[in-house]
Structure formats: structure tokens, C-alpha cells
Amino acid sequence: MTIALGQFTKDENDLFDTMDDWLRRDRFVFVGWSGLLLFPCAYFAVGGWFTGTTFVTSWYTHGLASSYLEGCNFLTAAVSTPANSLAHSLLLLWGPEAQGDFTRWCQLGGLWTFVALHGAFGLIGFMLRQFELARSVQLRPYNAIAFSGPIAVFVSVFLIYPLGQSGWFFAPSFGVAAIFRFILFFQGFHNWTLNPFHMMGVAGVLGAALLCAIHGATVENTLFEDGDGANTFRAFNPTQSEETYSMVTANRFWSQIFGVAFSNKRWLHFFMLFVPVTGLWMSALGVVGLALNLRAYDFVSQEIRAAEDPEFETFYTKNILLNEGIRAWMAAQDQPHENLIFPEEVLPRGNAL
């Protein structure tokens, strides 16, 4: 019996190895395999948004002017969602709706699906980029895990919510004022601010801002070696060979302030990761629930009593009336295809009126 000792050798011109060597080469801007997804999708998403906000009207889908060409500014320009009649069509340029006509494709709202889908894959590509780089330099993948929070929010709001409704029409358009309109829509039709998942999202984002402010201030406060530079920011010298702040001093300070404090840096920084990411995940779950038209808190007993007793009113019943007003005033403008008309006498008014 013959035993061959040695290493299996591949063909020197193996295509995969050649691509891997080029993609993962050490350069100023890392490309990587994730870059094959990230860079094209990000380019098309951003380019599509600039094209839409600069040149494309929303007259045929929303009855609105939405581009710089029509007189909008940065706050009012948008890439608008397709009309409700197009339902969940991908609106491909070569599809049955546009039939290869670029102008018609833009008029139908094809740029919105183009930007939304390329944007989603671009964000996923950016997360994969963080995974790939972390693996290359032997880091843990927590940066990528943290970035899954914004991805979850984007996908739930721009893709899953309209998929649960009758069409892409009910997703947010890509613009500043358009997002504000969508927030009003969410409040009026879903009572979103009283949803516990929204509450967790707000607690996560604002809690993270508080944690960042406290953490940054504490580190600056406990510096014990500022370096020997003459300028005001000598503490920011990046060439110091070791840490120059005191965790022990910080622990003692916050123990006196709150009675409790983080005892080690790992738990502290994990908590700073956990709070915002969990908040974003929870808010994304809440939006998925809204896609299915699930209701959160409906205090029916208060509504019944308010209907029976003109003098009984709570902040909850006042908010319900506000939501009815939002629905009534938005529906006629926001859903022109329904030809909704609300006479003055049916618009909601508070008990005091």
C-alpha cells in the first residue's frame, strides 16, 4: 500500500482564488465579497433618489409636485410610492406596466420600488461588510449585529408594512415631509404612539442617547493623564500607549450618585449595545404587527363612557378624537382614488364643542 504525503494543490489560475485575492486585498477602501452587493445597490439607491427628487413628478400617483424641477425644496421633494391601483407590483422597467418606457416607468412610481429594494439590499450588504471585515481581523461580529437594528426598521417600515396593506402606496415616500406625513398616517390609523412596541423603541433610542452622553462625559471627567501638548484638546492625543482614564474613579462617582454603577467595561459597553438595538428590534416588530392591522391598547370602557357622558373626557379619549380627525382630513387628500368626501358635520369634535 502506498501513502502519499503532501498538500493538495489547486490550479494556480483558479478563478475563485483570483477574485478572493483581489476583492480582499488591503487597500484604502476595502471591497470584499460583500462589496459586490453593497456598492452597486448603494449606488443605484442613492442615484435613484437623487434622480427622482430632481426630475420626477408624483402627479400621476399622488396628485403632488415632488421634485426640484417643479419648485420643491430639500424638505418637500420626494420619491413617491406608486399608485394604490398598482398594488404590490415590482414595477420592473421591462414589466407589463412600463413596457420598457423609462418616462412612463418614472410616472408610475417605478423609482420608489427601485430605491426601496436596492436600499434594502445595500443596507444588508453593509452589514455583511462588517461581518467580513470583523472575520478578517479576528473581531467579534457585534458591529454587524448592532446594524441589524436599523435594517430591521427599514425593512419593516418600507417593505413589510405595505406588503400587509393593499399596496406599496401605503409605504412612506422617500422624502423629509413625506416621512412626516407617514408618521401622521401611522398615528391616525394605528394609534402608534400608544403601541407598547413604539414605547420600547423610543425608550431604546432616547436611552441610548442618554447612555452615550453619560459615558462620554464620564470618560472625559476621569482622565488622569492629558499628555504634554499645549493645546486645549491634548487629551485627545491618539499616540498614548495606554488608557489614561480611571474606571475605578468612574465607578466610585456613579456609585455615590445612583447607589449602583457598572463594575467592568464589558458589561457597560454591552448595555450600551443592548439598549438601542433592542429598542429598534422591538419597534420593527411593532410595525410588523401594524402591517397585519393588529391593535395595541384600545381602552374601550373609556370610549363608551365618553360617548354616554358628555362631561367625561380623558387624555386617551381626546387622542382618539384627534386620530379620527387625522383619518378624516388625511383620507380625502391621501387616497384620491377613493373619491372620499367628508361633510363638515361628520368631522370629529371634542366633547367641549
From Swiss-Prot:
Residue(s) carrying N-acetylthreonine: T2
Residues that coordinate or bind a plastoquinone: H215, F262
Binding site for pheophytin a: Q130, N143
Binding site for chlorophyll a ChlzD2: H118
Subcellular location(s) per record: Plastid, Chloroplast thylakoid membrane
Residues bearing the modification Phosphothreonine: T2
Reactions catalysed according to its record: 2 a plastoquinone + 4 hnu + 2 H2O = 2 a plastoquinol + O2
GO BP terms in the entry: photosynthetic electron transport in photosystem II
Topological relation to the membrane, as annotated: Multi-pass membrane protein
Keywords, in A-Z order: Acetylation, Chlorophyll, Chloroplast, Chromophore, Electron transport, Iron, Magnesium, Membrane, Metal-binding, Oxidoreductase, Phosphoprotein, Photosynthesis, Photosystem II, Plastid, Thylakoid, Transmembrane, Transmembrane helix, Transport
EC number, UniProt record: 1.10.3.9
Binding sites annotated in the UniProt record for Fe cation: H215, H269
Summary of subunit composition and partner proteins: PSII is composed of 1 copy each of membrane proteins PsbA, PsbB, PsbC, PsbD, PsbE, PsbF, PsbH, PsbI, PsbJ, PsbK, PsbL, PsbM, PsbT, PsbX, PsbY, PsbZ, Psb30/Ycf12, at least 3 peripheral proteins of the oxygen-evolving complex and a large number of cofactors. It forms dimeric complexes.
Comment field (misc): 2 of the reaction center chlorophylls (ChlD1 and ChlD2) are entirely coordinated by water.
Name assigned to this protein: Photosystem II D2 protein
High-level lineage: Eukaryota, Viridiplantae, Streptophyta, Embryophyta, Tracheophyta
